[in-house]
Amino acid sequence: MKHNEVFGWTLKVLSFLLVVIPANALDKHGWRKQSIYSLLTDRFASTNPKPCNPEDREYCGGNWRGIIDKLDYIQGMGFTAIWISPIIKNIEGRTKYGEAYHGYWPQDLYTLNPHFGTEQDLIDLADALHDRGMYLMVDTVVNHMGSSDPRNIDYGIYRPFNQSSHYHPMCPIEQDKPLSLEQCWIGTEDMTLPDIDTENPQIIETLYNFIHDQVKQFKIDGLRVDATKHVRRTFWPGFCESAGVYCQGEEWTGQADLFCEWQEYMDGLHNFPVQGVAAESVIPLNDRALRKTAIAMNLVAHHCKDSTLLGLFLESQDAPRLAALNNDYTVLKNAMTLNLMSDGIPIVFYGQEQMFNGSHDPVNRPALWDQGYNTDGPLYQYTSKVNKIRRDLINSEDGEIYIRSITHAIMIGDHVMVMYKGPVITFITNYGAVDKEYLIKMPGSETMIDLLTCTLIEVEGEVMRTSIKKGEPKILYPYQLAFRDGFCQEQITLQEIDDVFMGRNEINGPDRK
């Protein structure tokens, strides 16, 4: 069936489908203001914790009740939403790649994963979040089902798509061919994922009704959509409209112009063009990575319809932990600052705040209970501080201007990036604990204050001089606005700049009038 015919059927389905937005659900504008803590349900918290060896690739016992018990830990860092693993029943047993503890090998769309808990457990999790003013984002998989044996697939185990005719014919994916990406099967010769025929009108209707009912039943506020690019683009607007909530899709490409095309079909996307280079910027002696990050941020801002609706992340279950690339705490603080203060909705992966250092799957997916829920750790405390600054900026008198402003990034040398977002100027460095001083020329004469240290930075004439000490990040805000909005109500200090420059650069900032 041709895509235009399928699109026509999609519109017909939607005309008959009653779309009810859940009472607690956020629209895309509400999600723009959130800060998301992403977690693997099986590895974050358990009501019966046991030692977990991630290299075994087995279920370790994490569950929804465990998450409820640890919401104080998440909220203590300032996060306002969580993103949990797919909730539906997956295939059982061991495959060549282990068990389906991650949730991405579905078997039954209408049954919850019993390893994670009951229907009531999931509803209680949603209620517990909403009672705190927090929100629930659920990962969803509708591109494929799971199979442990690609040579002998038993379609009868799947629900509701239990016939081979419900799937595209098996074929290997060719990455440079869009139709192949959409209709061929993800996997290897040892394990493959049967690709659902999302061109079939009856299947479209089934999936749209499924997600509508699931969101309503379990009080879901937003969806993370797996394998977005492996389903034709025109499928997604109807899917998200049926859900009645904000969707954030996985379109894994580093090319900003191609990436941004997808925002015509889904409001939210994981910001892969920025993530790919920003994560590399923590690698020691990687002189060009931070510059590439600034370029990527500006390209995404230019090409995308609205970069403030994207999800900005640096760690994930598919990527090395940042501390595996560099365990310098100062560098990781800067990375967290970038993660939380750039355009879009911040997403922090569980354990990032504890400086997990797994370099690859599966060792980058340990159980948090084995490491401990240390709320006194330096990066946990720092994450809480920056999240609070972001939240206070959003709640300020000019909060809407701030959160909707598009970031413009410029570089000073190879190791300092300056991000301008509305009235906020954020300095990010990646050279570690080294003293340097940078002379920034800016129009106007506003005294600024560093919201991280409550240090005043005076502007003389049209020149602001600010000293970056030991590679520390900075979040600058006009002092008059800070006073009005209640920032830094305790002790304020005046910046001291050494007379001897260990490194000096000059740059003209953009006109911010």
Swiss-Prot record:
It is found in: Endoplasmic reticulum. InterPro entries: A-amylase-like, A_amylase_C_dom, Glyco_hydro_13_cat_dom, Glyco_hydro_b, Glycoside_hydrolase_SF. Its cofactor is Ca(2+). Binds 2 calcium ions per subunit. Calcium is inhibitory at high concentrations. CDD domains: AmyAc_euk_AmyA. The record marks 318 as: Transition state stabilizer. Residues 1-25 form the signal peptide. Keywords: Calcium, Carbohydrate metabolism, Disulfide bond, Endoplasmic reticulum, Glycoprotein, Glycosidase, Hydrolase, Metal-binding, Signal. One of its GO terms (molecular function) is calcium ion binding. The active site is at residues 226, 250. The keyword Signal applies. It comes from the Eukaryota. One of its GO terms (cellular component) is endoplasmic reticulum. Ca(2+) 2 binds at residues 226, 250. It holds the Pfam family Alpha-amylase. Its EC number is 3.2.1.1. Substrate binds at residues 105, 144, 224, 229-230, 254, 318, 365. Glycans are attached at residues 162, 357. Belongs to the glycosyl hydrolase 13 family. PANTHER family: ALPHA-AMYLASE FAMILY MEMBER (PTHR10357), ALPHA-AMYLASE MDE5 (PTHR10357:SF223). This is Alpha-amylase mde5. It comes from Schizosaccharomyces pombe (strain 972 / ATCC 24843) (Fission yeast). The lineage of its organism: Eukaryota, Fungi, Dikarya, Ascomycota, Taphrinomycotina.
